[in-house]
């Protein structure tokens, strides 16, 4: 199986399976000399960790990260950083009834057809459990971007099923299990999820991610555009079925006189571009929106086939997220960080000494550049 590595200069290769002894990532290309400990990584892993509320899978994994290499006396050495997370709460017997059948909407069928073998225990390599090492690697990238450029990457849930979540303030996001930026809507979301779990069904979600203080100039036209690489990475997250940058599909209904972000000496007037023009960052906030499909492992009986091609009925039991989008916010943040650090290092290598007389204007009119 190929396709396990993301990035060009700052690369992340993940390994492991959902019910194997451990999962992890090897981060290569991290600049040397950055202070790094497990504590720098653990915070984001705890945000993604399962079993933290009744609205997510009840699989109890501590997700304690171990740094096995690439750090000496508390600082990165520039050599590969191996991050290990041990699996401790596998319950493989829950998957005994799908050894010979394929879950509708899951990768069971495609993995079997492609490889002729599949690990049915928790989905094996196709499990959302494999987003944990991505979050760990993303925490390393976040730290470097923050220290080098002051870049901050934050995300929130803007929709759960058919319920829109209006944005009120960032301060609400860490205060609830949904990463919702609105405290008033939490009771409605909880009632909705409780009913969904009773019904044995699942639902999708929409996640927004914003990177602020992004340097101007990241991205390589034509085929290594920053927004193209962001979309590529985000589509690598389990269950993501759509990605928008900036105004996204709303651009279709906008006129050019509205969509084009006007530049003034005081800054950009709008940010319909999502912080990327011509595949290159503008210095504005990079804004990304993700559509996440409903979880495929549900108790509701559904039609399928077995390995022999015979008709079968599939019911999935065990501990599953009724909405994988609830824990997707730190994953999306990590993916954005991994793309940004890779392009930052590439930009520094090729264009680090480029100087122009035109001043950098603020990301938004009225702000300081």
Curated annotation (Swiss-Prot):
Co-factor binding comment: Reduced FMN (FMNH(2)).
- Listed cofactors: FMNH2
Give the enzyme's EC designation: 4.2.3.5
Sorted alphabetically, the Gene Ontology BP terms of this entry are: amino acid biosynthetic process; aromatic amino acid family biosynthetic process; chorismate biosynthetic process
Would the keyword Lyase turn up in this protein's UniProt record?
Answer: yes
Its cellular-component GO annotations read: cytosol
Protein residues bound to NADP(+) = 48, 54
Q: In which pathway does it act?
A: Metabolic intermediate biosynthesis; chorismate biosynthesis; chorismate from D-erythrose 4-phosphate and phosphoenolpyruvate: step 7/7
Residues holding FMN: 125-127, 238-239, 278, 293-297, 319
Catalysed reactions listed for this entry: 5-O-(1-carboxyvinyl)-3-phosphoshikimate = chorismate + phosphate
- InterPro entries in the cross-refs: Chorismate_synth, Chorismate_synth_AroC_sf, Chorismate_synthase_CS
For this UniProt record, the keywords arranged alphabetically read as follows: Amino-acid biosynthesis, Aromatic amino acid biosynthesis, FAD, Flavoprotein, FMN, Lyase, NADP
Keyword Flavoprotein among record annotations: yes
Task: Name one molecular function that GO assigns to this entry.
Answer: FMN binding
What is annotated about its quaternary structure and interactions?
Answer: Homotetramer.
Q: PANTHER family, alphabetically?
A: CHORISMATE SYNTHASE (PTHR21085:SF0)
Give the family, as the similarity comment puts it: Belongs to the chorismate synthase family.
Give the function comment from the record. This reaction introduces a second double bond into the aromatic ring system.
- Recorded protein name is Chorismate synthase
Source organism per UniProt: Cupriavidus necator (strain ATCC 17699 / DSM 428 / KCTC 22496 / NCIMB 10442 / H16 / Stanier 337) (Ralstonia eutropha)
């Amino acid at each position: 199986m190929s396709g396990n590595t993301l990035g060009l200069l700052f690369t992340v290769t993940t390994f492991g399976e959902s019910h194997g002894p451990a999962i992890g990532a090897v981060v290569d290309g991290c600049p040397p000399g950055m202070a790094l400990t497990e504590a720098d990584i653990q915070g984001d892993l705890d945000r993604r960790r399962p079993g933290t509320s009744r609205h997510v899978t009840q699989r109890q994994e501590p997700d304690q990260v171990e740094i096995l290499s690439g750090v000496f006396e508390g600082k990165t050495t520039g050599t590969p950083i191996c991050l290990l997370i041990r699996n401790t709460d596998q319950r493989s017997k829950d998957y005994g009834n799908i050894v010979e059948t394929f879950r509708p909407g899951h990768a069971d069928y495609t993995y079997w057809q492609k490889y002729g073998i599949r690990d049915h225990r928790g989905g094996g390599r196709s499990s959302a459990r494999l987003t944990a090492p991505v979050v760990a690697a993303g925490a390393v990238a976040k730290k470097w971007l923050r220290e080098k450029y002051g870049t901050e990457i934050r995300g929130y849930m803007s929709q759960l099923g058919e319920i829109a979540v209006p944005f009120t303030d960032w301060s609400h996001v860490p205060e609830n299990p949904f990463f919702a930026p609105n405290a008033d809507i939490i009771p409605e979301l909880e009632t909705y999820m409780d009913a969904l779990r009773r019904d044995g069904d699942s639902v999708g979600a929409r996640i927004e991610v914003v990177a602020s203080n992004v340097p101007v100039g990241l991205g390589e036209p034509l085929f290594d555009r920053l927004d193209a690489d962001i979309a590529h990475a985000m589509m690598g997250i389990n269950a993501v079925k759509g990605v928008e940058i900036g105004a996204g599909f709303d651009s279709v209904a906008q006129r050019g006189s509205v969509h084009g972000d006007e530049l003034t000496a005081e800054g950009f007037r709008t940010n319909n571009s999502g912080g990327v023009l011509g595949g290159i960052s503008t210095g504005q906030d990079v804004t990304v929106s993700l559509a996440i499909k409903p979880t495929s492992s549900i108790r509701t009986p559904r039609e399928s086939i077995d390995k022999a091609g015979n008709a079968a009925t599939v019911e999935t039991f065990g501990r599953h997220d009724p909405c994988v989008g609830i824990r997707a916010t730190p994953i999306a943040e990590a993916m954005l960080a991994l793309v940004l650090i890779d392009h930052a290092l590439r930009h520094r290598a090729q264009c680090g000494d480029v100087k122009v007389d035109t001043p950098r204007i603020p990301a938004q009119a009225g702000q300081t550049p």
